[in-house]
């Protein structure tokens, strides 16, 4: 986020500036996971799709680390971090494109245990088509005809940093890589 965000005359400017300075916090509603739960999640590991695309996972994570989006550490180096939670990594093949990595934060209850801190009015997941059609139908005709333009922004990201103490909550167990210890990927920002 650009440092000049604080000077923008908008009600969200102070909030966005705080996120710029401190990162996004991730609060959980449950006690830290005991070591045996973390170990079980590590052993459960990632989705089989990630292991099937092991070379892609390795290259993609190396690229993400180079760009400062993720950090990859040996599990042993972070195993005792009190906020560490592990989610499985998946890899979705896409027709005529390279695969896409996904993190399943629902599998080990990370989503369920995460406190929703964002403003509720910003959380408009689902029913996108219905919302768009409603807006089109109820547009003010005084402004002329309504046009719709669909733009694919899947490769455009606004990366906002995570609060340093929150990043381990969203960690991912990487698939076993030959000759390497168990590895964990920790996001440094949210896409």
Residue ranges and their predicted role:
Residues 12, 57-58:
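Generic non-transmembrane alpha-helix signal with a bias for helix starts/N-cap capping motifs
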């Amino acid at each position: 986020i650009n440092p000049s965000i604080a000077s923008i005359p908008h009600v969200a400017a102070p909030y966005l500036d705080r996120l710029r300075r401190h990162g996004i916090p991730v609060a959980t509603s449950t006690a830290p996971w005991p070591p045996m739960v973390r170990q079980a999640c590590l052993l459960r590991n990632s989705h089989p799709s990630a292991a099937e695309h092991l070379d892609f996972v390795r290259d993609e994570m190396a690229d993400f680390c180079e760009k400062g989006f993720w950090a990859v550490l040996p599990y042993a180096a972070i195993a005792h971090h009190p906020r560490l939670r592990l989610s499985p990594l998946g890899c979705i093949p896409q027709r005529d494109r390279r695969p896409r990595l996904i993190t399943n934060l629902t599998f080990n209850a990370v989503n369920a245990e995460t406190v929703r801190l964002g403003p509720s009015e910003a959380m408009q997941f689902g029913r996108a088509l219905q919302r768009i059609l409603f807006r089109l139908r109820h547009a003010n005709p005084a402004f002329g005809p309504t046009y719709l333009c669909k733009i694919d922004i899947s490769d455009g990201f606004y990366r906002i940093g995570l609060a340093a103490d929150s990043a381990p909550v969203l960690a991912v167990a990487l698939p076993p890589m030959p000759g390497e210890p168990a590895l964990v990927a920790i996001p440094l920002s949210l896409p």
